[in-house]
């Protein structure tokens, strides 16, 4: 890691010109007219966006380490609060404890396109974080502000179809992170039929740039293969005849918003829409990958399962290990906690879902075989249990699971609600 001084040419004794980032940031923080402040914000943004990686690192480290809380102001606020101990002095103390970098970010947000610029700045910070010694302090400010600016009240839910703009459609192809869309015909098959839907969240400051999108299928039963969802020669059903909504792909679109939670809210909002539209819907499930399974097996003595990457032949060979692999997968998912385990499992279980079923050879793509030996899982959103299961999982209970999954994991009914101390 580079020495701190490498990033801080603004240290005492180094001459600062008008285009030096410290000069630009100090000017932005100073008392100015509205027009002068916007001009300063433009200068800061232009400096960052045109800088190379070395310049971006230096700027971000300067922002992280050089614009903390004003110590004198904080000491005065603490002293005042100790004397008064009233709501006003507490509010003043809170304001005084805020790092000056948050004021800088707020002023950058005042620019046209300012919110997008801050998202881009955080994306770059995440990319370069290994070379930003004080990244954690900086990212705390990014997350604090972005979580407020992107709270549910500001989010717009839209249904996307094949008549959506070509620009928006191309973004769906670009951002799809679970099951690649390899052609316009493939996109059409996901958006146009009566039993296929796609929904996305948008923010008024980002226009037609999606934050996250969710693809789903309306079916007559719970599917056990992604091929059943994606194949083009399937029989299309009327949406009002469907009994099951299957969420099979959810993709975050903005790297700079990583860690800002949208997915759980999107699923719940879509469930409400679907229930109002299709009274026949009774079951809400996912068909989800298990991206951490192969790695976990390799780390926990599962080396007997050889990596599979070339499709059906390996899938057939692996069938001899079917029961063992299903059991190990069930154990892996059952051990999920809010902070540990498969990332997709943490997401759905943290939103109140349960583990419904493991599906053998459900994804025979190269990625599906490599990361989970072709296994996929159905998580179930039982509307009568979501809130309870969300709280229980957050408080340390084992995930709720069907009797089939519980049996595969080797758990008794008595064990299913309680996490072992060593697990």
Task: Give short role names for the model-derived ranges.
Residues 1-260, 264-423:
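Extended, composition-driven regions rather than compact fold-specific motifs
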């Amino acid at each position: 890691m580079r020495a701190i001084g490498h990033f801080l040419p603004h240290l005492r004794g180094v001459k600062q010109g008008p285009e030096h980032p410290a000069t630009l940031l100090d000017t932005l923080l100073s008392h100015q007219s509205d027009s002068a402040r916007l001009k300063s914000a433009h200068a800061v943004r232009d400096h960052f966006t045109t800088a190379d990686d070395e310049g971006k690192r230096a700027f971000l480290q300067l922002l992280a380490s050089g614009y903390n809380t004003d110590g004198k102001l904080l000491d005065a606020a603490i002293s005042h609060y100790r004397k008064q101990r009233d709501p006003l002095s507490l509010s003043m103390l809170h304001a005084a404890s805020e790092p000056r970098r948050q004021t800088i970010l707020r002023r950058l947000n005042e620019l046209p396109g300012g919110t997008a610029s801050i998202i881009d700045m955080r994306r770059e910070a995440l990319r370069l974080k290994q070379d930003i010694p004080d990244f954690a302090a900086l990212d705390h400010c990014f997350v604090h502000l972005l979580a407020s600016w992107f709270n549910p009240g500001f989010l717009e839910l839209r249904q996307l179809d094949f008549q959506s703009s070509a620009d928006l459609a191309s973004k769906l192809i670009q951002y799809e992170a679970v099951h690649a869309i390899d052609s316009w015909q493939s996109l059409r098959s996901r958006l146009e039929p009566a039993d296929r839907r796609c929904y996305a969240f948008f923010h008024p400051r980002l226009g037609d740039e999606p934050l996250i999108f969710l693809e789903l299928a309306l079916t007559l039963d719970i599917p056990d293969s992604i091929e059943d969802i994606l194949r083009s020669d399937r029989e299309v059903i009327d949406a009002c005849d469907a009994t099951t909504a299957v969420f099979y792909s959810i993709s975050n679109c903005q790297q700079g918003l990583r860690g800002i939670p949208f997915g759980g809210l999107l699923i719940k909002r879509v469930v409400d829409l679907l229930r109002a539209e299709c009274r026949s819907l009774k079951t809400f499930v996912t068909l989800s990958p298990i991206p951490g399974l192969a790695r976990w097996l390799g780390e926990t003595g599962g080396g007997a399962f050889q990596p599979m990457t070339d499709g059906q032949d390996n899938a057939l060979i692996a069938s001899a290990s079917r029961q063992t692999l299903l059991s190990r997968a069930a154990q892996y998912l059952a051990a999920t906690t809010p902070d540990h385990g498969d990332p997709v499992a943490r997401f759905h279980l943290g939103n109140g879902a349960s583990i419904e079923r493991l599906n053998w050879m459900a994804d025979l793509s190269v990625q599906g075989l490599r990361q989970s030996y072709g296994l996929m899982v159905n998580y179930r959103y039982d509307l009568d249990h979501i809130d309870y299961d969300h709280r229980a999982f957050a408080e340390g209970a084992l995930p709720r699971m069907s009797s089939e999954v519980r049996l595969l994991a080797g758990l008794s009914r008595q064990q299913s609600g309680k996490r072992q101390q060593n697990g």
